[in-house]
Amino acid sequence: VLNSLNKAMQSSIQSIKLNVVAMRDFNDDELMDFVGLTKENDITVRFIELMPFDSHQIWKTGKFYGADHILADIKNQVGELKPIDGSRTEHHIFRVDDYKGKVAVIPAYSRSLCGACNRIRITADGKLLNCLYSQDEMNLRDAIRNDVSDENIQSMIQGSFLKKYKDGWAAQQSNGTHRESMTQIGG
């Protein structure tokens, strides 16, 4: 993995983002190793909260490591993190003083950024989701295969945005989550 990351950093790739699912008692002792990658390299390391989309229910084992704790642990090591302006639809992004790169936290489970979310996903089986935690799916695959007009497909997508819940908690409470894995959801 590090060899590939080094090759990417030596290439002409403009934006390199390294996603790390942070887990208590698994890799929480490596946070600073990941943050350290941003000291001399213009990359973004994004720490992602463990999400409840796994058939083995790992997230119920006490390994959940919330965004607030991730940030607090990083601050304890490097001092203040300077927030960077930008899209706050999926992550909080920061810069450490004198570091070339950036550090971000994606509160995927605590869902503190849902109010600004403008994202949708298309699942591996062609369903459109307006929230990771929603069961409200629109079958784009079948619409395309059945020669539904572009205008009607556009209307379906717009309708999906109009049906977004206020946040992921409301979406989950409304109808539960039936997908067992992020590989099914598209992430």
Whereabouts are the PLM-identified features?
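Conserved C-terminal portion of the radical SAM core fold
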Residues: 1-57, 71-78, 125
